[in-house]
UniProtKB/Swiss-Prot annotation:
Membrane topology summary: Single-pass type II membrane protein
The encoding gene: Clec9a
Cytoplasmic face residues: 1-34
Highest taxon above the source species: Eukaryota
Source organism of the structure: Rattus norvegicus
GO biological process: positive regulation of cytokine production; receptor-mediated endocytosis
Expression sites by tissue: High expression in the spleen, moderate to low levels in several other tissues and cell types, but no detectable expression in skin dendritic cells or CD4(+) T-cells.
Transmembrane stretches, start-end: 35-55
PTM field: N-glycosylated.
Descriptive protein name: C-type lectin domain family 9 member A
Disulphide bond pairs: C113-C124, C141-C232, C211-C224
Amino acid sequence: MHEEEIYTSLQWDIPTSEASQKCPSLSKCPGTWCIVTVISCVVCVGLLAASIFLGIKFSQVSSLVMEQRERLIRQDTALLNLTEWQRNHTLQLKSCQASLQRSLRSGSNCNPCPPNWIQNGKSCYYAFDRWETWNNSKKSCLKEGDSLLQIDSKEEMEFINLSIWKLKGGYEYWVGVFQDGPSGSWFWEDGSSPLSDLLPTDRQLSASQICGYLKDHTLISDNCSNWKYFICEKKAFGSCI
């Protein structure tokens, strides 16, 4: 009986000892994990904030780098365009200088009209000493790059009379005036009408084609198929006027 009481006493003492040993650790564990958890959360939040901050800064730096790159590209393009513009203008300047030098060298020899042609203002004249019909005379002038004489003013008429007659006076010369039918109006080759005081003298011709010629300071009408000398007119070289 005494041994059983001792055994029973031992059995009750063991649980009491284990409980007294476990309780301190159980009371300490929750507080430590809370601190660790809080610290971990703070670290995570800090890392997340740092990551977001660095991401924003990286994006800003990347945008700035791209802007700088685009600006450099634009500047390079503008520099290339400026260089090309300068090169072109340099070439143009050299070309102008060369043209000016050629003009200065040839200025003393510049003649506004071909050899043997007579100049009056912006026109050159030449009296051909071969006979042609009016139409053939017109074609011959076209081959020379000009047209039959067209008299637009009394002053031009006076010049022609004074100049041409000194060389070949007394001849009949076709000019570029014709009549539109036996009783029609008179026209120059360019379609304009002669001045009223420069109309050819009407000879009451019955020919189907009537043209005008110059003789003794007067315009006279005649059959276009008759043969006469003719006078051509062309524009003077503009650079020599």
